[in-house]
A protein has these predicted regions:
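Extended substrate/cofactor- or partner-recognition/assembly subdomains adjacent to catalytic sites
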Residues: 141
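Acidic, metal/ion-handling microdomains and their immediate structural contexts
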Residues: 138
Length: 297
């Protein structure tokens, strides 16, 4: 999988333009409202998109993962389209912060949590892509191997017929060497793309897990200052813990159990759903200390 450098540079340039526009938009909302723009769902989704674009630019520019935009661009497009086109206008307006959010911990806690969601979602998306491509790869590989085996057998029969020898004299090593088409199978043994995809998913999820841990700890300190206790089993807190345990399991499977490939990718794919439940699903309930009105964070 070798992307065209011209297309890759064009894509990176497009991401740079998107990053500038998102940054400008967030700054204008910050100046207009007088506080960091994280008071409702619209602003949090904008910041999530900003974090995803930043991660995309970082990974492509510094880690030379030129293929990443092929998978992340559609997801980002859907996210921004949902943010701007689906949410009601009243939810897109800047609002004054409720008393519970009027704290310096807002920037420390909420930004870190959303940054963790961005990294985790990106890593999980790569896990999903890994599973899809590996399935396609294995199916294509099996098909090609069957075709290759059939062609080799046909060539072997021709050799046997032309040389008037018995089939028993054709040994297994001879069978493997017969026919120039055998080299075709080597093309399907190159798994460097899958290794890169697997490692990139692992590293991105690891970054997201670190941010998630910091976000939970900072949230606990803020909760103690605001409500008098570090943990209250609020729905948001509970699902944040579930999210943390899910990705702790993922990292444990990689670091301790030594899993690679499809096994941890399945955990990452499951984590994709868990993150969205923690980020959006809990707010749909409209209950708990983290609910400050309909669709607000």
């Amino acid at each position: 999988f070798v992307p065209d450098p011209t297309y890759s540079r064009s894509g990176l340039f497009g991401y740079g333009i998107a990053f500038i526009f998102l940054t400008t938009h967030l700054i204008f909302r910050w100046v207009d409202s007088g506080h960091f723009p994280l008071s409702n769902l619209y602003e949090s989704l904008l910041f999530l998109a900003w974090c995803l674009v930043f991660l995309q630019i970082y990974l492509e520019h510094f880690m030379k993962t030129l293929f990443l935009g092929v998978f992340t661009s559609p997801a980002l497009l859907c996210l921004i389209a949902f943010t701007d086109l689906s949410l009601p206008e009243e939810l897109q307006k800047s609002e004054p912060l409720v008393p519970a959010l009027q704290s310096n911990w807002l920037v420390m806690h909420v930004t870190v949590m959303i940054a963790s969601y961005a990294a985790l979602l990106l890593g999980c998306l790569l896990s999903i892509v890994y599973l899809i491509f590996s399935q396609v790869f294995n199916s294509e590989k099996e098909k090609k191997n069957l075709e290759l085996t059939s062609r080799i057998r046909e060539e072997t029969k021709v050799i046997v017929k032309n040389n008037k020898i018995n089939d028993d004299s054709i040994t297994e090593p001879t069978f493997r060497k017969v026919g120039p088409t055998a080299v075709l199978s080597q093309k399907f043994e190159n798994t460097s793309f899958f290794t890169m995809l697997d490692n990139l998913s692992y590293r991105t999820i690891g970054i997201g897990f670190c941010f998630l841990t910091l976000g939970i700890l900072s949230g606990a300190i803020w909760a103690n200052e605001t409500w008098g206790n570090y943990w209250s089993w609020d729905p948001k807190e509970t699902w944040a813990l579930i999210t943390w345990l899910t990705f702790a399991t993922y990292l444990h499977s990689r670091l301790i159990a030594g899993w690679t490939g499809s096994k941890p990718a399945w955990i990452g794919s499951f984590g994709f759903i868990i993150v969205w439940i923690c980020y959006l699903g809990v707010n749909l309930i409209g209950q708990g200390l983290h609910s400050y009105g309909f669709f607000q964070v």
